[in-house]
Amino acid sequence: MSGTFSRCMCTPAARVFWNAGQVFCTRCLSARPLLSPELQDTDLGVVGLFYKPKDKIHWKVPIGIPQVECTPSGCCWLSAVFPLARMTSGNHNFLQRLVKVADVLYRDGCLAPRHLRELQVYERGCSWYPITGPVPGMGLFANSMHVSDQPFPGATHVLTNSPLPQRACRQPFCPFEEAHSDVYRWKKFVIFTDSSPNGRFRMMWTPESDDSAALEVLPPELERQVEILTRSFPAHHPINLADWELTESPENGFSFGTSHSCGHIVQNPNVFDGKCWLTCFLGQSAEVCYHEEHLANALGYQTKWGVHGKYLQRRLQVRGMRAVVDPDGPIHVEALSCSQSWVRHLTLNNDVTPGFVRLTSIRIVSNTEPTAFRIFRFGAHKWYGAAGKRARAKRATKSGKDSALAPKIAPPVPTCGITTYSPPTDGSCGWHVLAAIVNRMINGDFTSPLPQYNRPEDDWASDYDLAQAIQCLQLPATVVRNRACPNAKYLIKLNGVHWEVEVRSGMAPRSLSRECVVGVCSEGCVAPPYPADGLPKRALEALASAYRLPSDCVSSGIADFLADPPPQEFWTLDKMLTSPSPERSGFSSLYKLLLEVVPQKCGATEGAFVYAVERMLKDCPSPEQAMALLAKIKVPSSKAPSVSLDECFPAGVPADFEPAFQERPRSPGAAVALCSPDAKGFEGTASEEAQESGHKAVHAVPLAEGPNNEQVQVVAGEQLELGGCGLAIGSAQSSSDSKRENMHNSREDEPLDLSHPAPAATTTLVGEQTPDNPGSDASALPIAVRGFVPTGPILRHVEHCGTESGDSSSPLDLSFAQTLDQPLDLSLAAWPVKATASDPGWVRGRCEPVFLKPRKAFSDGDSALQFGELSESSSVIEFDQTKDTLVADAPVDLTTSNEALSAVDPSEFVELRRPRHSAQALIDRGGPLADVHAKIKNRVYEQCLQACEPGSRATPATREWLDKMWDRVDMKTWRCTSQFQAGRILASLKFLPDMIQDTPPPVPRKNRASDNAGLKQLVARWDKKLSVTPPPKSAGLVLDQTVPPPTDIQQEDATPSDGLSHASDFSSRVSTSWSWKGLMLSGTRLAGSAGQRLMTWVFLKFTPISQLLYSHFSRRGALWLQAIGCLQVLFYLLSCSVVLTQYSDAFPYWVSFLVLCGVFVWVFLVLGWLLLYFYSRLHPTQSVLLVTTIRRNVMLSFWLLSSANFGNLCAALWLAPQVSYVSSLASYSVGHVISGMLSYVYACLQIWPFLLFMWCPKGVVTSVGESV
């Protein structure tokens, strides 16, 4: 700009202003030259070189060189004179306005919000805007300490009269309290310092820019304070260090900055915990507060600065609350150092927190409560929780997330090679990843040394679980979400549903904060070098000991192990797999091989095998001895029929249940108990203690000494020791055999009472001395009686039905759970699958009941009291800490007196003996036919579950009903005299729909006709009239009773794998006569069986409508209908193709029309069958009633159609020699269409009740049903 002259000719007393680094006069707008040396005022610094006031002014300017950041240094407010005057004036009063603005600012020597109000800046059309991009036109740029007419590094807001696209700040807003600062350059930062009017020295830092190199260097006396400032506080915050308690070492302090996890602020867990936002939920229950705290941590919203303002507002809205501005409110909102800070704090203290400024007070009210107060908005860029003042327990976990403006220049990520490791896909991939990281840091091997552990489908390691474990192990790893920390050496990524890890080979490890581990740190974060002793010495062993726990408990298990590690002089299984030793590689390879082979051959779970190896290696003094012991484990032969886990382990080392006591009871009557922690004494030495935090511990307790060596394994957790009582298992010798015989005979001759309730609060083990060992007195009967009061954990019965061994299809021998004529064997083998959390009656993702597939590994996380292998209809007791409390758990000694048995009713615990050849007995006993009967039981449970409402399948009443239904089905096989009869009796299950109708489930499946009683009676009458089933033939049964086949013949074809009702007669009818009649009879039967199999193979395996026909007709009827239908379709298509293509001109149009109508008839018939099929699938319970009513009418119409068409075909073939070929085809087609139309009309008349059931409303159904 320029005035009348090129140089100012005004008096030196005329005020000046700065614009773009140049000095101009406020009177003439010309450039002001330097004053003569005798007129210059040194107290005014750079301003004194151009301005000589008439009177002495009360403010001074520090010496400095004018730069872009502050023009001039210490008097940046002089650069605001021109833009303020230009934006608030017109063309005719600009000079007068310029003089007015200069007078106001020169009066105090600074720019403050009061000066803007005095100059009526806001009334004249100016507003503050946050800087989000280039600003056109005139503007005044500012931050919390500095203003300029040009953009500068660290500028956060701009004052302009131009309408910018972003939203203007609400009035009265001003980014600074006083714009009056000195500007220096230090390392990569720009430092602002000033002294406020009350004498408080403030400092602020911003990132450097390209123009920062020309700044004045920071004085040496301020370097220590600036180092504390840049490490402990975020950018653009004017800080007075006197308000804070500081420490010399930054490693143990707290930092508000986004680039450093630690700082010089003294860390107080009761002050800097980031949880002050929970004061908004003080009016709620403690459970709500704990839930909100856990949710913020688990979802990653909790940071060291608190939580996001929008998240806090949303959580209040979810809880039905909101915050309103109330001057008398109990909650006070504060900001860090200035009101524009994004770091907020909520406090209940009336005194202002040092280092913070008070903004307002709020009150939490209900959403539905009318109020006159203004709603408080927490803000989209604010974080609440900086310095909580409420005294709370120390938080073990702190998380962080970056929300501040990151420095523009971030340290580059070093270029290095990347190696990826993909762990085994066994469900524990997340923990294998951590094991691979630790193994590489210790042994240099980037693989997981942990054996595979098959986890349940609903138990997986989340990113929150991995972050917790990484912090416990202090690993230099991060969980990659949208971005990765540049300082992390190991990057853990989720590839679909599988965790993988990458390592940066050429990069040095660094200690990572919570923000870096979670992956929400800033781009320019700085991490200290990784210390030499950063990794715990036994980190790998701690991870190996805890990774089999539930995923949400692994980090707690690692922390418990590191806090109280076991002694190192013994070589346990975990130590052998993880610790460096010459035998580690060979031990690990041999152990993984045995883990894959031995449990499958023995029919045991992987968990049982792992526990057995742990017991074998207990107190092992050296790795050589551990390797020698492992090498003694025998691999069972594939030809062996059945091998127990005990036979695979060396003699003298019981596989399953070596006692955890150092001294066994010397007398069989001695009681062994696991007492509560406050008990002063007990017999024997206590076994392993139950781990804290819900971790399961395995206790092995022998029932008694002797050849039988009856033992029990108890998997118990912290839940079993509530109320100061533990699990007590007593072992005692019976005083006489008559007591056991009376107990056995008391229920032996009674019929099975299906209505007898199972004991819900008593767990009892009953054994009996076998005739094979009459001299043994070791079969004592321990009984643990549990008492409950209705105030704490509940007992839930989770049904485990049906088992299959590892790779063979024959189930295991489970007869011990049902009969009392064999020794009590409580070994853990092939433990059945536990129900999932979503639906305890089904396996997730499949349409199979839970008894189909056994879990391949023993889950340490199952909160169940497991007593070895149970029967298919047995249940596992689970403890839930919600309603009942365990108050008594004392052993009952059966050897003392008869009164001891009076407290326990033997009829409640002794299972009824089933006949030898019943289906359940065959399943329990095992053998070649056990798999067949297990599949039949599978079908029974599946059909029964289909009749239940899906949401009720997990209820105890439904499970009890399922067991009773199976018992009723099993009763039909109680009169069998051969092991082959039960399969044929139960193969078809034709009686099961009627049985379900007679005894419906507690909550039947809902359908359209379920609420109409009149319609139910109508359907019942139709079903009674039309469904007359012929009695089953008993020829096969008589033959089986008279000539029983040898038991060693394998019955592979007793029941087909596809669930059909036919059975092979070849292997079940072996005749001892080798005469020619017998040979002829056998050959005839063999030929018939072969033909039958061929028809089945052709029409039931390779036709899409096979299951459709079979679901509604008998097997023979379905085969004949398919054969005739296929031939009819082929002939008809042949005739249609000939008539429509070659001889279309020889026939009138009505013949072609009838031919096309015949095609549509077949299409409609097929669609009707498909409709019936899908409806029966969607409504199985209702379909049982509908099929009986409809299928005979439909079959009659189908036979009518086929017979008429067959007659037409015969007539056409008979007339073919007498008439032309074309005439015969035409007559056949016309006859086919006419008969098809009649049959189709008849079929529709018969199917209309089916359509009525599906589509008509209930009222129409009632009226029409009554009329019919």
UniProtKB/Swiss-Prot annotation:
A zinc finger (C4-type) spans 8-28. It is a multi-pass membrane protein. Residues 728-758, 1027-1064 are annotated as: Disordered. The record marks 180-181, 385-386 as: Cleavage. The chain crosses the membrane at residues 1119-1139, 1153-1173, 1194-1214, 1233-1253. Its EC number is 3.4.22.-. Pfam families: NSP2-B_epitope, NSP2_assoc, Peptidase_C31, Peptidase_C32, Peptidase_C33, Zf-Nsp1alpha. This is Truncated polyprotein 1aTF. It comes from Porcine reproductive and respiratory syndrome virus (isolate Pig/United States/SD 01-08/2001). The lineage of its organism: Viruses, Riboviria, Orthornavirae, Pisuviricota, Pisoniviricetes.
